[in-house]
Amino acid sequence: MSAATATGLGATVDVAHEASSIRVGPRSDAADLRVTMGEPLRLAILVGREPANVAAALATSLAANAELVLTLSTTGSGTVIDRASAIREARPNAVLAIADKGDVDGMIELVEALRLACAGGPHTPHLFVSAEDKARVRIGASAGAVPVEAIPAPTTRSAREAVVARLRALRRGGGDIVLRDEAIEAAARSLVLATGRATLVLDVSGESTSLALVRPDGSLIAAHSRLGIGPGADRIVARSGLDRVRRWIPRPIDAPALLERVFNRARWPNAVAPSVLTLALEMALSREALAHLLRDAARAGLDRAALANTRWIVATGDLARFPRAAQTALVVIDALLPEGTTLISRERPDALVVAGAIATRATADVSGMTEDLALVTSLWPKRAITLSVTDESGTIEEKVARGAFFLMPTTGSVRLAFSGSAAREAAAPLVLGVIVDARGRPLDLPPRDAERVPTLARWYSALACLPIEDGSL
């Protein structure tokens, strides 16, 4: 694959993976750009009682792909010593302080706890303060030797982007690199410029998970985390719980055995799934990484419905590299639970990440870098309806009742129509075809293995995701 800008000039990009990098482009001696995760950023948040400021701080943390290690509020209980101990144990690299109007004294108490926590310590975090001018002077004076930098209140789009850019600079260190989350956002923007339609890019790699929604007006909704299906797999278990991963495995497996597999996967950089069970585990981890990030985005006040119901979803990273296209499609459907009709596509290996890296420096050409997998129609009919699918082979009609989940393979361009509705949908040639999902929202899995395993097996078999026999792997 050749990586090129819109002007035709070639560029060579190194894309870092778990324990190696892949070079894409014409040069063999060196790379023009490097895409990496950057340095981990441990972020602590100091906030008041204002809900908008709390949500803005959480959204900033997600946009900057910072690990939120501590949140302290001026309304919380505890002495200065208690707060200082909490900060010292959290070991933040950066602290984001957003002061409410009229509550400067409370923020000063939190900053004094920060100063106490850093006294005599080997590492001093950067303190970013958002407050009115007079209040910021008082807060800065209480910080002592802690370096203080003024930032705008991240409650508006432009201000949040400025704060995120500053936090990302800390992750770059002294290197001239493109952060992977930056490349994902730039790739989404390039796709929107090329197609004119809103695009959600989902990226799941060994060490990170990203959601980047760009609309035709240029607005961006983005969230990133250090959850992954490789070295970041143990983080998923630590934050979501083992049972939430286990519930997606279409076979009975006890918790200790599953936990061992998760931690073994975290210790195997660039591992290729050696068995069907391991592949099912990676699919389960991908679902939970995306679902957890969506929940974090909702808590931060981001538009979860807009993220989940975008009409075009593009998968990148390890999510796009599952051996079967149906595996990518099933993970996206189960994690996002889209409603209506959605087109699911995937990048060609590392193509969009490379294009995104180039797009941070110039205009990138993204034509031919994605392939359309499936047109997914999600519905919950009161009574059975008829779905008509027309492709090059003719028209096929299927009855759809509640609980249905199946694939209708297609050839060439596709058109959809529903009985009793004037709505029509169309798509270019698809790798899989049309996926009909009438399982309902939210998607509830039976808690007992005797019911859960056959249910999952039916869903996997419906899309021919995995070789399943006798109701299990």
What are these regions (language model features)?
Residues A97-D100, P125-E132, S205-E207, T310-L319:
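Glycine-rich beta-strand-to-loop/alpha-helix junction loops that act as flexible
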